[in-house]
């Protein structure tokens, strides 16, 4: 049995130029596992705490030296001599040491970086690909699938400096036969969309997640531009390719109303109907955070209205937290959960959220954050848990493409052992 002989933390930069935490877990046989914690822009109020320094003289207060010190001090002392393969024991030990509900003492970014680095070291120690080790931890050894990518090709909201309210307009290549084919389709549509926007005299600069970030007259104009790009690329909208939205509605929910910059102001019931109408007019098969995280009555209205046919994803709503997810399941709120490592702060708790969702008939979508690094762990998580769907941004920026490239490698390794199920991964 290999043992942990050293743990090192350091401050590195994410894709937005903000500091984040990287950790190395070193084993007695010389193996080193390294991992970085991501960071979000639009965040749920109940996410685990990302520990920042608050020292305005460094990185405008966003430094993470406190989290790094926690890795190099108490976390290192706690885990020296431990078995890296026993992920649950490592994570539970760190959670216990932290002693808070939201990991405010050590920092979720510190705990997560070590948690993922340990998993990578353990995979290497067993001579396993990371996705295979994750499948073992998930209790599903040897069971894999390739995820359908939800490609964010127009960015708005908190992810872009433009006037679009809805945060993400996504495409899914549901008619493709393999992940590689789906990735090619999405890439071709992305390039055709650039041409469509240019022809309309619109900006083709990209947002945090690599999607285009033009100023548009309405959310409808974004959907129309995507439809034109899909057709120009030679694909059929609704069969080859479908649409998805991330409203991030908490960002424009003010005083009990949903306030869109161009379309006006809506009550919860009215906004639920606004979204339902969009699904009737466009092949939108997934809507994330369609209502505010605190508007559970509105969520119930939306779920009852279109939940049988449309995937309704809780991100800010559930924050990868099993306690909150269980409440949602019991109340029949939404039908899907977005899975983000750093919302909960450990690999073990992430796997528990995926397992709970699947047991209740909810889908689970593995997701990046807007502040990413070259770390591609979420690709292995998607395959190793057979999640079926992944959100990792657009078809540019190496912080996004690194995940797609890892999925290409995995599909090449697994071949027919990992099916790409396309439309079957979604409701309706």
From Swiss-Prot:
Mg(2+) binds at residues 246, 288, 315. One of its GO terms (molecular function) is phosphopyruvate hydratase activity. One of its GO terms (cellular component) is cell surface. The keyword Lyase applies. The active site is at 209 (proton donor), 340 (proton acceptor). PROSITE patterns: ENOLASE. It holds the Pfam family Enolase_C. Its main location: cytoplasm. (2R)-2-phosphoglycerate binds at residues 167, 340, 369-370, 391. Pathway: Carbohydrate degradation; glycolysis; pyruvate from D-glyceraldehyde 3-phosphate: step 4/5. It catalyses: (2R)-2-phosphoglycerate = phosphoenolpyruvate + H2O. It is an enzyme of class 4 (lyase). It is found in: Cytoplasm; Secreted; Cell surface. One of its GO terms (biological process) is glycolytic process. SMART domains: Enolase_C, Enolase_N. Binds a second Mg(2+) ion via substrate during catalysis. Its EC number is 4.2.1.11. The keyword Electron transport does not apply. Keywords: Cytoplasm, Glycolysis, Lyase, Magnesium, Metal-binding, Secreted. Component of the RNA degradosome, a multiprotein complex involved in RNA processing and mRNA degradation. Belongs to the enolase family. Catalyzes the reversible conversion of 2-phosphoglycerate (2-PG) into phosphoenolpyruvate (PEP). It is essential for the degradation of carbohydrates via glycolysis. This is Enolase.
